[in-house]
Amino acid sequence: MVSVADATAPSGAIVVEDLHKRFGKLEVLKGVSLQAQQGDVISIIGSSGSGKSTLLRCINLLEIPNDGRVWVNRELIRMRKLRSGEAEPEDSKQVDRIRASLGMVFQSFNLWSHMTVLENVIEAPVHVLKVPRKLAIERALALLDKVGIADKRDHYPSHLSGGQQQRAAIARALAMQPKVMLFDEPTSALDPELVGEVLRVIRQLAEEGNTMLLVTHEMRFAREVSSKVIFLHQGRTEEEGTPAEVFDNPRSERIRQFLKAQH
């Protein structure tokens, strides 16, 4: 992959500066900033509607921010303003390159239903990265073994449990060898008894030093795996710090109320 890092860019795997996002007249993000260094695991917490998922979707350009700047691996995503006040990316090839470097795992799995688990995992490496099919299969089988579903390689998603589908989705994201993993509430659509198997995989990825941004309602898990926790409230960063700072010594009343409601 071509490296186009800017020597003057702020250091970090992901840097977000003063990000704003509006849907019509509703401003969902009101100037959010964050910085993730290589190997950081940042959990983004907050009530529903606080802007957590929108923030992740703006980072990989599934949503286009209205204002602010985003650097991925020290490469600034170039945007241009439209007369309408909206913005759009300047370079579609840059968007493709940025997205290929970010692994995204959604709460709803988003597996292709007409493909087997193995076919889901090799699809993007073969067609986007142009990895030889034999090598892509080899890597995919190793990833399916890593997430504990190697025996499901020839199954279709509809034949898997929710936890197995989400682990397949994680393997699919990892198959692109991303620089950063983005998890958007990866356990919220799962039955309670299946949550643990997905969290174990994410914990392993954290322990291996992967850079990750994790939107989650699993407070105990966030405390255990995160290097940093960010609490969003009504589209703004209300609190930010280490897990000990945020969970044990929160400064704002809003996060105290939020954490109390989680028990």
Go through the PLM ranges and name each one.
Residues 2, 231-234, 244-263:
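C-terminal boundary and immediately downstream tail of ABC-type ATPase nucleotide-binding domains
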Residues 2-12:
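Extreme N-terminus of proteins, especially the signal/transit-peptide cleavage junction
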